[in-house]
Amino acid sequence: MGFQNEASSSSYTLKIPPPAREDSPLLGKGPPLSSQFKTFANVFIAVVGAGVLGLPYAFKRTGWLMGVLLLVSVSVLTHHCMMLLVYTRRKLDSFNAGISKIGSFGDLGFAVCGSLGRIVVDLFIILSQAGFCVGYLIFIGTTLANLSDPESPTSLRHQFTRLGSEFLGVSSKSLYIWGCFPFQLGLNSIKTLTHLAPLSIFADIVDLGAMAVVIVEDSMIILKQRPDVVAFGGMSLFLYGMGVAVYSFEGVGMVLPLESEMKDKDKFGKVLALGMGFISLIYIAFGILGYLAFGEDTMDIITANLGAGLVSTVVQLGLCINLFFTFPLMMNPVFEIVERRFSRGMYSAWLRWVLVLAVTLVALFVPNFADFLSLVGSSTCCVLGFVLPALFHLLVFKEEMGWLQWSSDTAIVVLGVVLAVSGTWSSLSEIFSVKV
């Protein structure tokens, strides 16, 4: 079923998507946002996540100046591609008397490319959301393994390390990840997000608190000591840094719901630009301060550099609890897609358990948090954030866009594909290389 564009010379056929559940776990079905400030705040909440904790380590690898340039470039490109999605939906809505039937990224894929478009979007949403959750488990396992004193024979880490090495043949980090598994089976068996919604507020508060503590600690350390730092780490690390930057700004799934809920839609682009600019400044400050404070000793999770004080321990435990409860929120769109395709949209506990097990197994084999951020950013986030928005925009506007617009969309598609392929290869090489 489709609507023909009769008011335009374009022969594009709009495919009306069937009713579908939202693909983004970040937004509920609450009342429409009525102010620009609320939209700004929601952009911040949707984009800023645990990936920020890996930025200082990424700056150590790439050099602080290259890191800044990559963050700014990715921020500008991400905003542009988000707006391409908005423009594409507005164009398709104009074919249907201005009534929007496109509520999510998957709906837009269906409207532009039919079932194939939805399948591609769904696939990369599954990979990206599951990738985020793998990162969460890596963070939890690594952080808990580092919190206790390994030299103390009575410490929890010592007992876990001895148990793992002598009896099970696995590390304490792996045991902590396995320890999360049965509890995640229970949390991910909850049918609706309604009961988990308050946890998203808690997660945002903990994230902001952790960032504030780290920035203060970094500033105090910088005043006492200034380790040697480098501006450029070499072009060989460009793809690595690009992957981490793309991961850090991933939030393309929220842009269409946010634009729909904003009262003054004409100002959405400006509000989104302000939000992305503000986030960029925070990311740059966080990354530079962390690197300046610890130099070559900067760890892949910056909170691990804070030492063993009470404040540091509370922050790290708070982040672990935050990510532990954020896990089911981020897996929810994966469950919706898989259940829609394999159980006719009906709730399926065993499908959810299989997916949680798969995510857990992947987390066990990834040694480094920041390296995995680069992998997810280079692979799925590049496709979702750059390739698909530009491709959909190109297909819908191809008969009325000028040469400059056509070249811009085509260049973004090509750039996204090149970054995805080369960045994925580079990240996998980093993960599986033997580091001495």
From Swiss-Prot:
It is found in: Vacuole membrane. It comes from the Eukaryota. One of its GO terms (biological process) is neutral amino acid transport. Keywords: Amino-acid transport, Membrane, Transmembrane, Transmembrane helix, Transport, Vacuole. Disulfide bonds: none annotated. The chain crosses the membrane at residues 39-59, 66-86, 119-139, 167-187, 196-216, 229-249, 274-294, 310-330, 353-373, 377-397, 412-432. Residues 1-38, 87-118, 188-195, 250-273, 331-352, 398-411 are cytoplasmic. Residues 60-65, 140-166, 217-228, 295-309, 374-376, 433-436 are vacuolar. GO terms for cellular component: vacuolar membrane. It is a multi-pass membrane protein. Residues 1-13 have a biased composition (Polar residues). Residues 1-21 are annotated as: Disordered. GO terms for molecular function: neutral L-amino acid transmembrane transporter activity. Ubiquitous. The keyword Magnesium does not apply. Translocates preferentially neutral amino acids from the vacuole to the cytoplasm. Belongs to the amino acid/polyamine transporter 2 family. Amino acid/auxin permease (AAAP) (TC 2.A.18.8) subfamily. This is Amino acid transporter AVT3C. It comes from Arabidopsis thaliana. The lineage of its organism: Eukaryota, Viridiplantae, Streptophyta, Embryophyta, Tracheophyta.
